[in-house]
Every structure is written in C-alpha cells, then in structure tokens.
C-alpha cells in the first residue's frame, strides 16, 4: 500500500485490486476524510499509545505469528521510510545464504522465527532425527502440528521440541540485536500468537539477547510483551485517524482492562 497516496498498490492474495485509490473511494462513499495504514503499523501505534509502549518516545514492535510483521515508532510517529517499506523487519537477513523465505530472499528472520516455519522445521527434524518425541506421536496419530504443540512439548521437557524452540529464539535474539544496533529504541515489544508462550518465550530470548548486547551500563534495551492483544490494531487505527484530524494522539489508557492474550 501507499500511505501517502491512500492507495492499494498490490494485494497478492486478492487479484484485481492493483493501484486502487482506496481512500478516495471510501471517502466519496462515506463523505468523510479517510486515512490508510498498514495493519502491523497500526498495532504498533496502539501499543505505543496505551499498551506496552505507553510513555516512551521510540519503540519497535515485532508481531510473531504465521509470519513476522513489524512497526517502528520514532519520536511518537510511525516510521514508513522513503519507499513506505521501512518496517519490514521480518525480512531482515539473520542468516547469510540461509534458507529461502516466501519473499524470495535467503535467511530472513521470518524464515526462522515465525510460527509457520517453526512448525515446518519441527516436521523436518522429525524425519531426520530418531529421538523419541511427543511431537512424533502426535503426527503418527494424524494430528497436524502447530506452534502451540511445540511450546507445550518444550514445557514438558521434550528434547526435540526444545531444540526447535531455542533455534527460533536464537534467530529472534539476533533480530532484536539488529534492531538495537540500528534504532536504539526505548524498548522492543513482541506481539502475535507466539507471545502466549509468556515466560517460555521471554526467558530464553532475553538470555540469548543479553549475551549479544553491548556490555555497557545502562544501554540494555528492554524486550516486553504486548499488552493489548488483538485490540492493538483497532486502537492504533483509531489513533492514526485521530492524529490525522490534527488533534494529536489520544490518551485511551483509562478505557483499557487488564492485558489481553493474542488469539
């Protein structure tokens, strides 16, 4: 999409919507001003306004789901970049000459730490590794593996599942270190379905991340889990619209309940 022009440039999964002036179309129908924003950026803005990023100036969010989305907030504003593709952090290279990502590039973070490729790596390991595993028993019974099964097996001490999980955490830690080296944000926020693993994600990730970080006092960028769950995108989209009206970012924290889980 083009935020500046209010256009859909290309939707690979929905043919026929190329170069669609969406904002103009909806604005004419509704007789109201319309703004356009990427869903990952909107979710990051929601967390910045009244979630895990409330009160900071600079924040980077990674959304860990079937893929890895991201949003970058710099001095309270969404960063789009010159070509409006400045927040594709799921496609930063974390393994030179690594495995091929769906985007066509080799070694992308998404290829190593998303839920989709976590499951694919587990399936591949089950074929090449003879160790007993509850994951193997699940596949024999005809059950399709997903990331939740891998996390649960890891919690139970399954060696193969732990290998799969810690591999994903290693590459995610590399991605977080790269973010710190480039942006030096106040914090990194993690969202998406994988964050439901809670401390089973945050503890090993933080240990690996801290081992790679600068050994300087007071420069450790914290990694936090998102607080708004699936509401973040809606809240952020409302914030984008509110800000576009010239009213400044809203304070919506008084209307929020306890932290939500991702769906």
Language model feature labels by segment:
Residues 85-88:
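Structural signature of FAD isoalloxazine-binding scaffolds in flavoprotein oxidoreductases
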Residues 35, 58-63, 69-71, 102:
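Short glycine-aspartate micro-motif
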């Amino acid at each position: 999409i083009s935020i500046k022009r209010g256009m859909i440039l290309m939707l690979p999964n929905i043919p026929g919507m190329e170069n669609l002036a969406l904002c103009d179309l909806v604005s004419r129908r509704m007789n109201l001003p319309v703004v356009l924003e990427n869903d990952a950026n909107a979710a990051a803005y929601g967390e910045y306004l009244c979630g895990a990023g409330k009160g900071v100036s600079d924040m980077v969010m990674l959304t860990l789901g079937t893929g890895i989305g991201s949003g970058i907030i710099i001095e309270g504003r969404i960063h789009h970049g010159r070509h409006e593709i400045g927040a594709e952090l799921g496609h930063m290279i974390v393994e030179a000459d690594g495995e091929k990502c769906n985007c066509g590039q080799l070694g992308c973070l998404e290829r190593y730490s998303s839920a989709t490729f976590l499951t694919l790596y587990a399936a591949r390991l089950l074929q090449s590794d003879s160790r007993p595993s509850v994951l193997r028993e699940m596949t024999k019974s005809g059950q399709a593996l997903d990331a939740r099964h891998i996390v649960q097996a890891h919690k139970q001490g399954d060696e193969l599942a732990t290998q799969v999980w810690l591999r994903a955490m290693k590459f995610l830690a590399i991605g977080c270190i790269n973010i710190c080296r480039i942006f030096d944000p106040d914090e990194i926020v993690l969202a998406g379905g994988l964050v439901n693993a809670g401390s089973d994600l945050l503890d090993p990730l933080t240990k690996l991340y801290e081992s790679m970080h600068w050994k300087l006092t007071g420069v450790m960028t914290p990694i936090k889990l998102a607080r708004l769950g699936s509401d973040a995108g809606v809240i952020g989209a409302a914030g984008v619209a509110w800000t576009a009206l010239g009213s400044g970012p809203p304070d919506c924290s008084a209307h929020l309940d306890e932290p939500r889980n991702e769906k």
